[in-house]
Amino acid sequence: MPTASINNHEMYYEIHGSGAPAVCMGGWGTYCHGNEKALARGLTDQHKVLVYDYRGIGNSTDDPNTTASMRLYAEDLIQLLDYLNWTNVHLIGLVGMGCCIGQEVAINRPDLVRSMVNMGAWASCDQYLFDQLNLFRSVHRDSGFLTFQEFVCIYSFLPEFYNENKHRLLGPDGQWRELKDNYGTHERLVEACLTHDTMERLESIQAPTLIIHAAKDMVTGPRTTLPLEWGINGAEGVTMKDVAHVVAGKEQKIEFCNILFSFLAKH
């Protein structure tokens, strides 16, 4: 499988589908290693989609002596896109730090960006989000991965979905499994999330931008996503009124795909 020596680490990536180039990034996990099935259905039919492992996740290495910052993770992606000779790329950030990486790329290398999508995002942490993310990290450190996993799943899914799917969400092969036995990486990912701050630079983003607001998201809901819509010139905002932190279930996924593909088709 492809790896590249990027920004002083070995960076694992995969490319799926064909068409106009797009990058899809999530939170503290990966769309690689079979997880491409979690991409928006039909995305790889219309686009050549790059997915990759963040530093310390999956098959990507990391240097713990390098200060973790969103700018570092964004520079990894920038150098990977340059390595692949990709430009004019749709940046799709979903449910966490992938959104923040997209913001930094759009600000620092606008030549690479055709459009940007953010969902489950923030421009900077208010005290509430800061304490939430820090608490997730502390629970992992002090109580172990499985307790952390359960704690975050309860925050991330609607009660009805959690009740019906708890057996699939939890356990060694469940959600955020990339962080099992990998607290050091989680610590660094959270540090980058806590210190991320593009609030005063949002106006420099020129790429067409879609901000999706998840009305029932208890982590990164409209409180943290609306400032992005307000701060980015010409940004389009759409609210999914019955969605929590993670888009889950057939109906929500269909609604999300309709919103996403409608935006991409215009740009």
Pin down the residues of each PLM region.
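Conserved HGGG/HGGXW glycine-rich cap/lid loop of the alpha/beta-hydrolase fold
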Residues: 7-62
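Short beta-strand/loop motif that positions the catalytic acidic residue
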Residues: 205, 211-213
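Acidic catalytic loop of the alpha/beta-hydrolase fold
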Residues: 216-220
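Catalytic histidine neighborhood in serine/cysteine hydrolases
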Residues: 225-246
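Catalytic histidine-centered segment of alpha/beta-hydrolase-like enzymes
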Residues: 243-257
